[in-house]
Amino acid sequence: MKVRYFTNIPSPYRINFFNELGKKCDLEVVFEAEKAPKINSDWYKDNKIKNFKSIFLKKGIIEEQKINFKILKYVTKKCNVLIFTNYSYYTEMIALIYAKLLRKKYILQIDGGIISYNENVIKRKLKKFLVSNASCYLSPSKETDKFLVYYGAQEEKINRYSFTSLYEKDILKKCISDEEKNKLRTKYNIPYKKVIISIGQFIPRKGFDWMIDAYKDLDKSIGIYIIGGKPTKHYLDLKDKYQMDNLHFIGFQNKENIMNWYRLADLFVFPTREDIWGLVINEAMSQGLPVITTDKCISGLELINNGENGFIVKCE
């Protein structure tokens, strides 16, 4: 069976997924571009395309609000199944409209969605047009199901898929011992009795500013580590303002190191103001960590049983 996927960039978790799917079918993946802006290039360096054919419409960085008409060629090209993953990027948007005009059936796979009840009428109608015309949907959560139905999908056409960056071998069968945890803390030069970590880009949407504000009076025997890049002046100023010597900013880490950070920690906090999924929740839970996140994180809403394996808090 010939399957053609359309997606934005070669995110490592997508490459892993496509390599597995390519074992089951004749898979071709059309990427809009090679990279996204403001993402460390090391993120892509372990990508290995093995079991599928890759096509890049553009070299370099993706331009979400420009149309690359090269995509239309691959909408018309013969295959058994068309699958789209983005309805909000202009290039895939025009491809979805083109598929509709050609009366081609297609599957819409989305990672998540948050309903915008206050959006203007034109934007809402465009979303409904783009979402409602799929012949089938792949959704990772109940919240995403609600999103799809709100924008015109028929509930009986929605199918569940597991959205993750993990292989089964990555998941701990049991939590590591205190001895192993302490060895990791020694390896990473961590002197604290308890450790809280968070992972993500230093951008307002990730909510690190209000997390720092919330933890400014935390006991100094608790170490707080935010991992994911170079902090902007705003976050450095907050650290100085609150005299938080126990707050540390850690640069980009590869997968092996990230897994070690999860294992050595006592708590994972993800204070996002909006994430249509949030794969770090899957990752933290796979290493036995309790998680605190907000009601604007779809993976948290799907995976956390409040008070059992973590807590959902109301976004600021």
Language model: regions and residue ranges:
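Short hydrophobic beta-strand element within catalytic cores of glycosyltransferases
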Residues: 290-294
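Aromatic "clamp/platform" in nucleotide-sugar-dependent glycosyltransferases that forms part
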Residues: 273
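Conserved donor-binding/catalytic core segment of Leloir-type glycosyltransferases
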Residues: 4, 189-206, 212-215
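Short alpha-helical donor nucleotide-sugar binding micro-motif in glycosyltransferases
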Residues: 252-253, 260-265
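Donor nucleotide-sugar binding/catalytic pocket of nucleotide-sugar-dependent glycosyltransferases
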Residues: 132-182, 190
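A short, histidine- and acid-enriched strand-loop-helix "catalytic/donor-clamping" loop
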Residues: 90, 104-122, 133-136, 140, ...
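Nucleotide-activated donor-binding/catalytic signature segment of Leloir-type glycosyltransferases, i.e.
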Residues: 236-253
